[in-house]
A protein has these predicted regions:
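Aromatic sugar-binding surface patches on proteins
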Residues: 266-283
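Low-complexity, Gly/Ser/Thr/Pro-rich intrinsically disordered linker/tail segments
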Residues: 188-245
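Short, aromatic- and glycine-rich surface loops/edge beta-strands on solvent-exposed regions
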Residues: 4-10, 249-250, 278-284
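Active-site-adjacent structural segments surrounding the nucleophilic cysteine of cysteine proteases
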Residues: 9-95, 159-165, 221
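Extended low-complexity, serine/threonine- and proline-enriched intrinsically disordered segments
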Residues: 232-265
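Conserved active-site-adjacent core of cysteine acyl-enzyme catalytic domains
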Residues: 73-75, 79-208
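Short, surface-exposed beta-strand/loop "edge" segments at domain boundaries and coil↔beta transitions
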Residues: 14-17, 143-147, 177-184, 209-211, ...
Length: 284
């Protein structure tokens, strides 16, 4: 086998806090890669469909990876929002959510065995055979972009079309126009050409593992006639959003539909008032 040695140096400017290493991930790329196709399989897995246009636009197109990671976890019953994943894995140095290592670490914080890997078709087929969807990096053209760009998609299966005697892959493309258009297929020959080899594998969460997923605090709303806005209230105490608040304030109106996950709901952005409250969108 191949051995690897890592050195981690921890430091903090807060003399009252002891720095601690909670999760460590490492990835390597082989110098020589004998790509293999493996044996064709015919299996389709369920993977929730999330698209960029329905979620927080402040992260930009880098939001594709948090969308796919949320889908990978939610298929195992996690019910995490892509925005929660994005805030966990955001690279504070660049403000980007496109770092695959941070994505794997975010899933690890939620209790899921997750790792980056360079995979070929054989590896991907083995993952699908084992019942596990995979995040894959595809080079493709995006509307409005002249040059091909990398897009993270969710691989959810392989199939065969008897009519044309061709194999195909089943993908979830978060850059689609709507949630209903996320599911797509691609011929295996085309997939092999556009797939970069970068992948993120995720396995079901063990029952006995400790997780550190985002904390959710149930609050109520109270209306202020004086300020003409709504405020969050926690146990009767008004909670004001600070001026430097950098999160995403959004509401999800009841639409009478039983959604598979919370992330399937339609969220509408809310306006933060100068007093630290909210205003709902005009249509609400």
């Amino acid at each position: 086998g191949t051995g690897v040695q890592l050195q981690v140096n921890l430091s903090t400017k807060n003399d009252k806090v002891t720095p601690a290493l909670r999760l460590l991930a490492a990835a390597v790329r082989p110098l020589a890669w004998d790509k293999q196709s493996g044996h064709p399989i015919n299996r389709r897995l369920y993977l929730p469909e999330y698209c960029l246009s329905a979620h927080d636009p402040s992260f930009g197109r880098d939001m594709d990876l948090p969308l796919v990671m949320a889908a990978l976890m939610n298929r195992w019953g996690e019910d995490i929002l892509p925005e929660e994943v994005a805030h966990i894995m955001a690279d504070k140095a660049t403000g980007s959510t496109g770092n695959a290592a941070f994505a794997a670490a975010a899933a690890g914080c939620c209790g899921y065995p997750c790792w980056q890997a360079w995979m070929d078709l054989k590896d991907l087929r083995e993952q699908i055979h084992d019942g596990c969807s995979v995040a894959v990096r595809i080079e493709r053209r995006i509307r409005g972009q002249r040059d091909p760009v990398g897009v993270w998609m969710g691989l959810r299966g392989f199939g065969h079309d008897d009519a044309v005697l061709a194999d195909f892959v089943l993908l979830n493309d978060p850059t689609a126009d709507s949630d209903g258009a996320v599911n797509c297929t691609m011929a295996v020959t085309d997939f092999a050409r556009y797939f970069t080899g970068r992948a993120i594998a995720l396995r079901p969460k063990p029952r006995d593992i400790e997780a550190d997923r985002p904390r959710r605090v149930p609050c109520s709303f109270e209306y202020s006639t004086e300020d003409d806005c709504w405020y969050l209230s926690l146990r009767g105490q008004r909670q004001l959003l600070p001026a430097e608040f950098s999160g995403w304030a959004a509401c999800s109106p009841h639409d009478g539909v039983a959604h598979a996950t919370t992330a399937h709901r339609t969220f509408r952005r809310m306006e933060r008032t100068r007093t630290g409250g909210f205003r709902f969108p005009p249509e609400q």
